[in-house]
Amino acid sequence: MVASHTVKLIQALEGDAAAIRKLTREAYAKWVPVIGREPKPMTEDYTEAIKKHRFDFLYVNGELAALIETIRCSDHLLIENVAVSPSFQGKGYGRMLMAHADKLAASSNFEQVKLYTNKLLVENVRLYIRLGYSVNREGAVVSGIKGTSLRGA
């Protein structure tokens, strides 16, 4: 018997910064030993970011499971952050959020969606490539971090 899940996507509001921070810190904690420091999303000021960027929450059976942060640029949509709660990872919710970003881009007449990630987050890079993204460039970005820039059509 397959369990049914109620999945809702809701745009976050300015008062949701604490929930964004909590979920993001939980989601990225596993990467601290891999890269030797907290990934950039763990250190962001979400009280300020939510005023400038779009955040969408994904709820599963009423529980906050994941979020995506996007930024409308002049010619593309930038995915700034995708965070999935550890208890919901590996269940396709990150893919759902990536598909949501594609819809947001299309509704803004953008032909591209871009994102940046630390190349040491290998399982994330593999997921993005499976979703149709291609590596645009690699190199040191902010603070000497080895980054990977990906773009999707």
Question: Whereabouts are the PLM-identified features?
Answer:
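Acyl-donor-binding surface of acyltransferase catalytic domains
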Residues: M1-A3, G152
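C-terminal "cap" of GNAT-fold acetyltransferases
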Residues: E44-T47, F55-D56, E111-L131, R137-A153
